[in-house]
Amino acid sequence: GSEMCIRDRINTPELAEKILEEDKVDMVVMGRAQLADPDFCKKAEAGQTDDIDYCIGCNQGCYDGFENMDMECITCLRNPALGREKECEIHLTEKPETVLVAGGGIAGLEAAIILKKRGHDPILCEATDTLGGQFLTAGEAPRKKEMKAAAISMAKKAERLGVDIRMNTKVTPEMIEEIKPHTVTVSYTH
């Protein structure tokens, strides 16, 4: 007989497995899931589902690339390296530096995560008692729960990597003077 496959918004290994176990299809196609995290299948197979960067279904960068043929490549809100993998390759630094990251939204979290993976010592300061910033808030809207989940997942990833996270902490000139970081990055909006 014919092979049957299914695609579209199948975003987790659990959902893909459930569909396959129902024996209604022979194959599950997960395109956007693998744009968001090119190691999706490897991580799922290894049982590292907490490390997967899940697609949030925003359809911004991936669809824009199909609609605008002048774009050099498609992009992804969850995978800033998409289409620029070689340029964004992570290498360990030979000179670890202390970097003060002001803001615990997704930009600050991503900066801290990448810095830590490169061997630096990021100190992430969030002025409130919650990480995730506006992405967390946006995830409260109907049908946007993936945004909230992504913000929570990024916070957990930063914690697992050992990022020094300081909640209810505003970056001040006095703090900068005390810590004497090599660099300060501002990753918040107001």
Where are these regions (language model features)?
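Conserved acidic residues
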Residues: 3, 26, 182
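Catalytic cores of alpha/beta
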Residues: 11-23
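Beta1-alpha1 glycine-rich phosphate/pyrophosphate-binding loop at the start
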Residues: 2, 101-167
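Glycine-rich phosphate-binding active-site loops on the catalytic face of alpha/beta enzymes
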Residues: 25-40
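FAD-binding core/adjacent interface of flavoenzyme oxidoreductases
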Residues: 56-68, 90-92, 164-188
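Cysteine-cluster motifs in flexible loop/terminal segments that predominantly coordinate metals
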Residues: 41-95
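Conserved small/polar residues in nucleotide/adenosyl-binding loops
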Residues: 1-8, 189-190
